[in-house]
Amino acid sequence: MPAAAAPSATDVLVVGAGPAGSAAAAWAARAGHDVVLADAAVFPRDKTCGDGLTPRAIAELDLLGLGDWVRGHARNRGLRAAGFGHEWQLPWPGGRFPDHGSAVPRTELDARIREVAIDSGATPLDGARAVDVERDGDRVTAVVFEDADDEQFRVACRRLVVADGVRSPLGRVLGREWHRDTAFGVAARGYVTSGRSDDEWISSHLELRGVEGELLSGYGWVFPLGAAAGEVNIGVGTLATARRPAGVQLKALLEAYTDARREEWQIHGPVRAPASALLPMGGAVSGVAGRNWALIGDAAGCVNPLNGEGIDYGLETGRIVVDLFDDDDWSAAWPATLRRHYGHAFSIARRLAGLLTVPRFLPAAGPVGMRSRALMTVALRVMGNLVTEEDRDVVARAWRTAGRLSVKLDDRPPFTAK
């Protein structure tokens, strides 16, 4: 629906139609709410992303009814991890989650999940950029939008869900603040034609070298998109903190990494559609909720500090936030919900990610970690967000214990109120 035909009021207004926002709109509509799903873009549109879908993300897509659809795309068995003289093929562990992952370009994925939201009853609103809010005391009563002609209009709402991505412009209006004292990501990706677009393993190179051969605190990836696509998503990501900035030229690094993989992956031609982004990670944001509004997905910093993945968290938070709708005040309830689901894991993960930015840590720890298949299997499970509260094995118990201890040491735990 174009902005000119926008409804003047709704029960639930969702701003941002990525995976998180569209999931929230779908679940809210299925729960019987009147929903408007707004986005600044006109779909289909691209987003900077590695396009990888972990088994946890596949499980959420199953719940939305997209299981058959996603399995009709690339299907991978696990991770091929390489670096420091070693290479391992590490299958997804299965168990509570599917034993496979996928990779779907965001242009296609986001459009399809948005269709599910619309089919569930949400009203779409395209080309509408949220620029301000109206309030009555501590409640948001309406969002002010601008259309393509810079004409303003408003949509009144009883509940507001903000899913406008890593930059979260509407979140900033509402008081969201990103704290860069813990690790954040600096990443770039593009697409290349590859003779191995149907490879059954996503690949990560954990010994990422800069254009001068220097070791960087990050990794490179190659995610096959399937034989029909004929392409792979190729990218690089590094970690940084306010004290230890990344200091890399992403475009040059992406080109160098692509050239290094060219023969191995039978890559032809230049990188297509290169794009980059900064990624707040591990709940390193404050101001994620108010009386009748909440931030979800990337806007809330729900990104894994160890690999930059956020689609599964986006889909989950889009589903979980609907449980708040009967509460009168979300300002404390939503941060508490996020901490309950992700706080411990985010705390220890961003602490480990911060260590990787220390110059001497990775050269010492990298070769030791890559030597052990058992250790890398544990790393896959942790990096893939595949440890749940229901798991009772040694790895799960150790990870949760480490997370609880880490939170106690945090100056600013994940999802702090201010």
For the regions a language model picked out, list residue spans one by one.
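Conserved Rossmann-like nucleotide-cofactor binding loop
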Residues: 20, 43, 167
